[in-house]
Every structure is written in C-alpha cells, then in structure tokens.
C-alpha cells in the first residue's frame, strides 16, 4: 500500500526543522556509483516521525536509517530508479519521503513509481546483493528498462510511504535551483 499524509509535521516542528536545514550545509556522502548530499537528523526527530507512522499504520516500527537530502539543478541530477530493499545490509519493509522545501516547479514533480521490464513494480525480497548492485549500476539510468507507473505529487510537508521493494525515483530527475529538500526514512515492522 502507498499512502501520503499532508501537513505531516506539526507547524512548529516543521518551521524549526526547515530553519535548521536552511542554515546548515549539506555534505556529500558517497556510495558505490552514487553521491548524495545529506544532513543528519537527530533521535528526537526520528522518534517523532516513527511515532506518527506507528499511529498511522497501527504497527510497532523500527527505524533503520533516516536523513535529510537535497537535489537541485546541479547536484543529484540522475534518475537512479531503484528499490530500497538493501539499506546498510538490512531489508526494510517500508520507505518514507517527507518533502521539506517549498515547491518551486509548476511541472509535475514528486516521487515516481516505475515498472521494470523483467521484475514489474517491485524487486523480489530474495534478490541477491549482487543483482541489487547490478541493477543500480546497469539499469538505474536506462529508461528503456522502465515504464513510468505513477507520480505522487510534491507538496511541502507531505509524507509518502511505500513498500521498500517498490521501484521509484524522484521525478523528474532534475530539481529546481533552490533545491528539493526531503527527509527519508527506511523502517521495519516489528
């Protein structure tokens, strides 16, 4: 199930968090074949998000990883269509994207969900790490391997949660000059 919640953070927390994001620098974090520009989060913020998700989903949840990231018209401009089934050696059940910055584009913008020509809409949970890595390197930018299924539109303080096995990317691949700031979290159902 995919769902989204508008006004996810309460107003004070949202304003405080965006002030902090805008007054701090993002640092490059390198992974095989990809760099991200991130800011770390803190336990209080992660706990707030997790508690809100637990209330919404009706399950006890465990955070695997959460951080803020930015993309703009220069930084992080590739498609990188992928699944989140392998996060720091763990297999999350779900992923969350929380849009933090104001929308600066009138074009369709948000989180795209894709269908792979072989696997369909999601990567099988039994997929090996080698196949996961191969797909990221060989197919994440090859639009001939993918069909766009849908796009959940961008909205400031909108959270979208989806199964971690689903193939997705930002949409489109290039964000606006001021930057698309998001919080991402990968989590398990206990």
Please name every model-derived segment:
Residues 74-190:
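Catalytic core of non-heme Fe(II) oxygenases with the double-stranded beta-helix
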Residues 1-81, 110, 117:
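Non-heme Fe(II)/2-oxoglutarate
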